[in-house]
Amino acid sequence: MSKIIGIDLGTTNSAVAVLEGTESKIIANPEGNRTTPSVVSFKNGEIIVGDAAKRQAVTNPDTVISIKSKMGTSEKVSANGKEYTPQEISAMILQYLKGYAEEYLGEKVTKAVITVPAYFNDAQRQATKDAGKIAGLEVERIVNEPTAAALAYGLDKTDKEEKILVFDLGGGTFDVSILELGDGVFDVLATAGDNKLGGDDFDQKIIDHMVAEFKKENGIDLSTDKMALQRLKDAAEKAKKDLSGVTSTQISLPFITAGAAGPLHLEMTLTRAKFDDLTRDLVERTKTPVRQALSDAGLSLSEIDEVILVGGSTRIPAVVEAVKAETGKEPNKSVNPDEVVAMGAAIQGGVITGDVKDVVLLDVTPLSLGIETMGGVFTKLIDRNTTIPTSKSQVFSTAADNQPAVDIHVLQGERPMAADNKTLGRFQLTDIPAAPRGIPQIEVTFDIDKNGIVSVKAKDLGTQKEQTIVIQSNSGLTDEEIDRMMKDAEANAEADKKRKEEVDLRNEVDQAIFATEKTIKETEGKGFDAERDAAQAALDDLKKAQEDNKLDEMKAKLEALNEKAQGLAVKLYEQAAAAQQAQAGAEGAQATGNAGDDVVDGEFTEK
């Protein structure tokens, strides 16, 4: 069987690897580099890809960068006097990788495993497969990037059982996956992410800073100058990389533009502290997906054995420190963050060809899938973070007598009502025989394949008639919709938490009132008038707050009552102890005297 190459098709850089024996090997490009810039430029009818394209980006307006961010959209890019889809541009990058892989191997390559961010939607995954097809590659498998990284990290550790957290911050996307490794099984427990966060955003913060500073000094807005902007981008990327190793870097861009008095130059010192300040909000955004993934996996931080950093942006010191602070662990640096994803993809290729034995990769679907049922309810058939491939069936019935057809409304999301979730598609099962409501048996089956592609089938168990829909790429979720669903679900979870806290408070108030009234009654006539009066006053205050239904006041008055009731209970206990000691003779009498001292102290603290 011919080799299956592994490709990491990245936003900023791409890489290709192949399995040699039992080891995954990165293939260097014609310039000797182990990663290739994901840049395409057009010049005199020639297509230039990689390092050469990146070098001429400043002077060549027909240069395309970060095309991955447009995958799965209908947006096109203009270059070379034509319009290109993201799939076409991506295919050019894939063709280049394929070409130098063929030169290295000395044979034709027709099959590949390509990685995508874990949170890529159906449209983006389909677009990636289409790009592979355009490039002449049969895409054997789409693998999530953090999963591929885990595969490369754990291949030589199949005899160990570990739970690992993969923190993948690339050029344009961010993913967190939690996996359980053991006996050759790589089981993804949960995944979370942000498809609009990556190294490009860190670059943009520096660009915005440079533009603002230059405008302040010279009154000229460089953001409107395309050539100047490309120079700023190159300088920002270099400064970002420099600040991973030094605490200050000099940005020097001579002849950046011209003013009334002649040429103008951009000279600036950027410190790591300033860079950290500019990008603080971006670093903060990495924390929520980490917490979400841990919560979904049902794990605590103490149960994570290793934290693996993936993606070039994890070299940023502030990011590393945030990971340490969030996980409480020193990240494992045994893998190369730029190469590990492609290496994992090649290993998956080896699993497919049979060259890698006893390795099983179990990935997950990032959002729940289901249908709309009576009353507009979203009935889940497949839960978020379910291992794929998977299939799930459930039997439903009609909502009205003699109903001739049922509409199957396919949805994806986490909210309980259908209207709050994302519609993936609709189809109809017709020719249902006339029968009272609830009698017909309609079986709905969801299938998700190994690449995350969804298909839904509805079957009338009485007539055996069935109808199927495959969710097409144009019905995939956008990044914004995924973010909205997650935020909505989080907002609802927060509301549920508050409701529970309110119920718990009311129950606690009722219990405190009952217990205090009992104690006040038991201490009547026992000489604790001051303490009893204080407890009674606090009790009356709490009852008033309860009657007014003021939660914050109830909480405060409850704390006050607990303090006063405790003082009264102490007095009651001390009296009982003193009486018991009085019966023990002279030694007991001395002890009673001490107890009396305690009473004096108690009155002092109550003052």
UniProtKB/Swiss-Prot annotation:
Q: Which residues belong to the signal peptide in this entry?
A: none
Keyword Signal: yes or no?
no
For this UniProt record, give its keywords in alphabetical order, as a comma-separated list.
ATP-binding, Chaperone, Nucleotide-binding, Phosphoprotein, Stress response
Q: What induces it?
A: By stress conditions e.g. heat shock.
Compositionally biased tracts (Acidic residues) = 598-607
What residue ranges carry the coiled-coil annotation?
Answer: none
- Ranges for region Disordered: 580-607
Phosphothreonine: modified positions: 173
Chain intervals with Low complexity compositional bias: 580-591
Q: Which InterPro entries match?
A: ATPase_NBD (IPR043129), Chaperone_DnaK (IPR012725), Heat_shock_70_CS (IPR018181), HSP70_C_sf (IPR029048), HSP70_peptide-bd_sf (IPR029047), Hsp_70_fam (IPR013126)
MF terms from GO for this chain are:
ATP binding; ATP-dependent protein folding chaperone; unfolded protein binding
Q: Which family does it belong to?
A: Belongs to the heat shock protein 70 family.
| Function of the protein | Acts as a chaperone.
| Identification of the protein by name | Chaperone protein DnaK
- What organism is recorded for this protein? Streptococcus gordonii (strain Challis / ATCC 35105 / BCRC 15272 / CH1 / DL1 / V288)
